[in-house]
């Protein structure tokens, strides 16, 4: 079997994540080489929301897969559109890292301790909305750039950015998983509890995408199956079903986190899903929690996880989420 070509963005975080997956596949006996692909999201200076959010980093990489320029690709699952082009499949979802958001603030401050009207940088409407829900006094600053550039915007942390940072913000909020993968967990001043800020659906998880035929047969398919983590795939399936049912993209102010726990005295497990929709100014939020006992078999369990996400989305709509954000159901189950 010839070497597997793994398509990746050129950013440090993307290549780090791709190397992590390449290492897993190499441990399964595959020869894997990274192939760098430039995306519109990498070259544009517009905000993520202005670019549409949905699939801005994925489209070029998916095209490379379909055109045979790459064999697999590694995505941050939270950035991947819920709709999938014909001919592509999620071949593996490795074990998830910390799904929480993390605050990096000057002087070791926490969210509670930030001064009145403190400036907090984020490119995520979801993060901004939930931050304003608990701290309406904050000044939210829309930021772009790689992780190091964003860290360098914090006062006193300019050393993180290449050639020095602007140091013009009191804090930034980033995914804890990305900071950890780059070795920057030490910069975190507070891991934001999901009861305060729910993460993006599938945050902390990676998705290994491949051509559909390659996900079913051969050495690559077998290796992908072995690095797939059932717990992570189940959680991500439920969380992303919320986005799909609400026809929302990765830039929508929607948070979701699913957790799998055993049932005492039973062989079954319960999947609990917490979801939130927040007004962009933080003035109103709608939260729901739903649970389901999962069957032991893989496919029925995945179907139940998807249905759980749809149920959560319907409950959000029932409680007025469409009035909070521009949302609609792709189809009602009730």
From Swiss-Prot:
The protein's name in its UniProt record: Porphobilinogen deaminase
Organism: Cutibacterium acnes (strain DSM 16379 / KPA171202) (Propionibacterium acnes)
Pathway annotation: Porphyrin-containing compound metabolism; protoporphyrin-IX biosynthesis; coproporphyrinogen-III from 5-aminolevulinate: step 2/4
Reaction equations catalysed: 4 porphobilinogen + H2O = hydroxymethylbilane + 4 NH4(+)
Its EC number(s): 2.5.1.61
Keywords annotated in UniProt: Porphyrin biosynthesis, Transferase
Cofactor(s) required, per the database record: dipyrromethane
Recorded GO MF terms: hydroxymethylbilane synthase activity
Cited Pfam families: Porphobil_deam (PF01379), Porphobil_deamC (PF03900)
Family per similarity comment: Belongs to the HMBS family.
SUPFAM superfamilies per record: Periplasmic binding protein-like II, Porphobilinogen deaminase (hydroxymethylbilane synthase), C-terminal domain
Oligomer status and interactors: Monomer.
GO biological process: protoporphyrinogen IX biosynthetic process
Coiled-coil intervals: none
Annotated cofactor note: Binds 1 dipyrromethane group covalently.
GO CC aspect terms: cytoplasm
PROSITE patterns: PORPHOBILINOGEN_DEAM
Protein's job: Tetrapolymerization of the monopyrrole PBG into the hydroxymethylbilane pre-uroporphyrinogen in several discrete steps.
PTM sites of type S-(dipyrrolylmethanemethyl)cysteine: 250
């Amino acid at each position: 079997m010839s070497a597997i070509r793994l398509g990746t963005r050129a950013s440090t975080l993307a290549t780090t994540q791709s190397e992590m997956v390449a290492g897993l596949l190499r441990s399964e006996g595959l020869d894997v080489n990274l192939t760098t692909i430039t995306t519109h999201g990498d070259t544009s200076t517009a905000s993520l929301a202005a670019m549409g959010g949905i699939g801005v980093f994925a489209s070029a990489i998916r095209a490379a897969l379909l055109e045979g320029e790459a064999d697999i690709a590694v995505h941050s699952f939270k950035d991947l559109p819920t709709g999938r082009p014909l001919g592509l499949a999620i071949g593996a979802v490795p074990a998830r890292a910390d799904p929480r958001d993390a605050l990096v603030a000057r002087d070791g401050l926490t969210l509670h301790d930030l001064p009145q009207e403190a400036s907090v940088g984020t490119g995520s409407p979801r993060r901004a909305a939930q931050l304003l829900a608990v701290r309406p006094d904050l000044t939210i600053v829309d930021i772009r750039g790689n992780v190091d550039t964003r860290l360098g915007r914090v006062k006193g942390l300019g050393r993180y950015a290449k050639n020095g940072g602007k140091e013009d913000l009191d804090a930034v909020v980033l995914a804890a998983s990305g900071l950890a993968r780059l070795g920057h967990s030490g910069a975190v001043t507070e891991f934001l509890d999901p009861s305060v800020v729910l993460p993006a659906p599938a945050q902390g998880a990676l998705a290994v995408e491949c051509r559909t035929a390659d996900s079913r047969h051969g050495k690559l398919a077998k290796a992908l199956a072995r690095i797939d983590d059932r717990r992570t795939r189940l959680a991500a399936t439920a969380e992303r079903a919320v986005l799909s049912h609400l026809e929302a993209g990765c830039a929508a102010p929607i948070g979701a986190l699913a957790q799998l726990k055993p049932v005492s005295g039973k062989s079954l497990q319960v999947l609990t899903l917490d979801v939130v929709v927040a007004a962009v100014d933080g003035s109103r939020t709608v939260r729901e929690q739903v649970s389901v006992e999962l069957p032991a078999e893989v496919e029925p369990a995945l179907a139940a996880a998807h249905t759980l996400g749809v149920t959560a989305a319907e409950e959000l709509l029932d409680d007025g989420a469409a009035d909070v954000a521009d949302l609609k159901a792709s189809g009602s189950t009730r």
